[in-house]
């Protein structure tokens, strides 16, 4: 919390469940209370509630259920600007990676964005299979 007060452009949380569990255990809170506290903290910093008055963007890594559903409360879904899923076309070493948005308030939904991490230091991407 004090670290965030400095002000950042972007913060990566890996993973939402892990951080939520840590907050819950450290404070002796219920899961719901810890989640509300985290969401309120993110909302505060998204609205520039920090020393540098930066509108902080948060990237939260969140697991999916075995059925492929979002694991978390509806409040997380509601406060999220965009939800992207990293997936594979095919199986094995040659399966192509892609990103697909299931929710995106500022762009398209449902388009597969293929990407490659094979060239060190570069991320290549395309809307068509490479």
Regions found by a protein language model. Give the residues of each.
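P-loop NTPase motor core
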Residues: 1-100
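Conserved P-loop NTPase
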Residues: 88-130
């Amino acid at each position: 919390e004090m670290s965030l007060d400095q002000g950042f452009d972007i913060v990566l949380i890996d993973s939402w469940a892990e951080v939520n569990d840590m907050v819950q255990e450290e404070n002796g809170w219920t899961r719901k209370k810890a989640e509300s506290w985290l969401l309120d903290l993110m909302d505060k910093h998204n609205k520039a509630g920090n020393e540098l008055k930066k509108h902080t963007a948060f990237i939260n890594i969140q697991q999916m259920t075995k059925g492929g559903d979002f694991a978390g409360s509806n409040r997380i879904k509601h406060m999220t600007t965009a939800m992207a899923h990293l997936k594979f076309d095919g199986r094995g070493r040659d399966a192509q990676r892609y990103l697909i948005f299931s929710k995106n308030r500022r762009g398209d939904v449902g388009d597969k964005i293929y990407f490659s991490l094979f060239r060190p230091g570069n991320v290549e991407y395309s809307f068509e299979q490479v």
